[in-house]
C-alpha cells in the first residue's frame, strides 16, 4: 500500500548548505503543506479528511539512537541494518520526524561522510510514522573524492566521466533531497493506500491507463 512502479519526486538541491539546512527547508514545506490542506478542509466541511496539527518543529533522531531503542524494545537489529517499518512500529514513533546520521556504507556514492566519523554519513530520512517520505544528504563536491567513492562501490568511473567532468570547473558545497509526492499526500491527508493519491496508479498489477 506504499509502493508504485511510477512515482513523482520533488527534488531539492541548494548550494552552500548542508543536510541540516535541507531538513529546515523540508520543515518549512511540511508546515505550509499542512496549512494548505487544513484550509481546504475548513472550506470544504464535507471533506473526508481530518485536520492535522501543525508541529512547532519536526523532531530529529539519530540512527544510533533509534537502533538502541529498537534493541531495548526487543527488535532483532544491528548497527548497519536498515530500519524496517516493523521495527519502527515497536518503538512507537508517529507523526513527522527525521532520522539522521545514517551509516555511510549503504548510502549512494555522492553522499558525504561526517567530519567526525567517516563511518557515518551526513544524511537523513524524513518519516511519517513508519512511512519514509524523503531522503537527503550533504553531497560530495570534490571530483577526486567522488571518483574514489565510485571506485569503492565497484562502479566504473569511465562510465560516469561526463558527470565527473562537471566537477573540474568547480562545484560549491551543496546538499539536497528527494520527496515522494504521493507519499507526502498520504501523510497530509491520512490516506492509507498510495494508489488513492494519484490519478492513474501504476504498480506491478497495472500499467495502463
Q: How would you describe each model-predicted region?
A:
Residues 1-16, 123-125:
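Residues forming anionic-ligand binding surfaces in small-molecule and nucleic-acid pockets
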Residues 1-2, 20-24, 109-112, 137-139, ...:
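Short conserved micro-motifs at the rims of enzyme active sites and ligand-binding pockets
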Residues 11-22, 130-132:
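A generic structural motif
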Residues 12, 66, 99, 136, ...:
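A residue-level signal for conserved active-site and pocket-lining positions in enzyme catalytic cores
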Residues 13, 99-100, 127, 134, ...:
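Residues in well-ordered beta-strands of folded domains
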Residues 18, 67, 105, 132, ...:
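Short loop/turn segments at secondary-structure transitions that flank enzyme active sites
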Residues 26-129, 152-170:
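Metal-assisted phosphate- and nucleotidyl-transfer catalytic regions
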Residues 137-138, 143-209:
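Active-site pocket scaffolds in enzymes
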Amino acid at each position: 500500500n506504499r509502493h508504485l512502479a511510477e512515482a513523482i519526486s520533488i527534488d531539492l538541491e541548494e548550494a552552500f548548505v548542508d543536510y541540516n539546512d535541507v531538513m529546515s527547508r523540508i520543515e518549512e514545506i511540511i508546515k505550509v503543506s499542512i496549512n494548505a490542506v487544513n484550509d481546504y478542509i475548513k472550506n470544504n466541511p464535507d471533506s473526508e479528511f481530518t485536520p492535522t496539527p501543525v508541529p512547532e518543529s519536526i523532531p530529529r533522531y539519530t540512527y544510533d539512537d533509534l537502533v538502541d531503542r529498537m534493541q531495548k524494545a526487543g527488535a532483532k537489529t544491528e548497527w548497519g541494518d536498515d530500519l524496517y517499518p516493523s521495527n519502527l512500529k515497536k518503538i512507537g514513533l508517529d507523526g513527522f520526524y527525521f532520522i539522521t546520521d545514517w551509516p555511510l556504507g549503504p548510502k549512494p556514492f555522492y553522499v558525504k561522510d561526517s567530519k567526525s566519523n567517516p563511518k557515518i554519513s551526513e544524511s537523513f530520512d524524513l518519516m511519517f510514522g513508519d512511512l519514509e517520505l524523503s531522503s537527503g544528504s550533504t553531497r560530495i563536491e570534490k571530483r577526486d573524492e567522488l571518483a574514489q567513492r565510485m571506485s569503492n562501490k565497484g562502479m566504473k568511473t569511465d562510465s560516469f566521466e561526463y558527470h565527473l567532468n562537471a566537477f573540474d570547473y568547480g562545484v560549491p558545497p551543496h546538499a539536497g533531497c528527494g520527496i515522494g509526492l504521493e507519499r507526502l499526500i498520504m501523510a497530509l491527508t491520512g490516506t492509507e493506500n498510495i494508489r488513492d493519491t494519484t490519478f492513474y496508479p501504476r504498480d506491478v498489477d497495472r500499467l495502463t491507463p
